[in-house]
Amino acid sequence: NQLEIVGTHKRIPDGILYINGLPLVVFEFKSAIRENATIHDAYKQLTIRYRRDIPELFKYNAFCIISDGVNNKSGSFFADYEFYYAWRAESDRQLFQLGEEVDGINSLHSMIKGMFDQANLLNIIRNFIYLPDTTNKEVKIVCRYPQYYAATKLFENIKEHQKPQGDGKGGTYFGATGCGKSFTMLFLTRLLMKSAHFASPTIVLITDRTDLDDQLSGQFTNAKGYIGDNTVASVTSREDLRDKLKGRNSGGVFLTTIHKFNEDTELLTDRTNVICISDEAHRSQVNLDQKISVTEDGVKKSFGFAKHLHDSLPNATFVGFTGTPIDATMDVFGEIIDAYTMTESVKDNITVRIVY
């Protein structure tokens, strides 16, 4: 009753999930009652012994599962052990909302019901595994559960609120600092670009700091194949953005900073399949109201950068990512569609506590 895989040596993986005859997920289990067998041993079995002895099996591999019956983690075949993570929530993330602990055998149940739900699994394999266009080492990024649920929920909310039928408020995502929001944006961009509903939209990614812009630019320009669009570019000025959008009816991913939008910014496009994704959406990207200042020369009226952005893209749908949600964020981008708190992030070993 055992499936033997023969390469340079014969190996017997504990479990293989086949889809249409392709071995897409490989499982390795260790006993929870054997003190000398750990989940890390399962990782080494996969990435050292199997990689050496039966590499052909992993030509089709999407991701791997390691488990000792208590700890259960998923990750890329190429990932270091610390980048294997538990899948702690089912499709509606109800477990965390109810405050139930998702450890031990519960984490196995949540992985099976969440990650291995048929629709979720096919969606993950199709849209949530990112391989960079170029890299000097073996890299494959598999989504974690907060990234998967956030991207899919935002995608559906954008469809619901897209202009002209909707109000253009695509929703707010509240994610703890350091939780991988840039990859969530990348996964969301892939969903939008591959959707027939949006008819090859134009995506504008907006930050409020040049270092954030540089970080996102490096990531997105190396993901053209994954996104499915060869036009992924940083915008150097308002005029550059105007030139890039002029005459464009579809497609393109453009990265810019909010400060490029001021009172001189003209209408860039009135298309409805333009999606603006704002990073750090609690800062300078929510100032839509008029400001009045009194100077020696009299009363001066002005608007913030966000007002000029919205005026230049009047029919776009706006999505906000933030680690610090405030009322103004939700006024501009809409209600919080999903959240990943610092408590969850610490529990998942994504961020660490600062104790003083």
Model-identified regions with their sequence ranges:
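ATP-dependent helicase/translocase motor core
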Residues: 1-202, 207, 211-227, 249, ...
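Conserved helicase motor
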Residues: 210, 232-242, 257-263
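A short beta-strand-to-loop transition that corresponds to the Sensor-1 phosphate-sensing loop
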Residues: 69-70, 209, 256-260, 280, ...
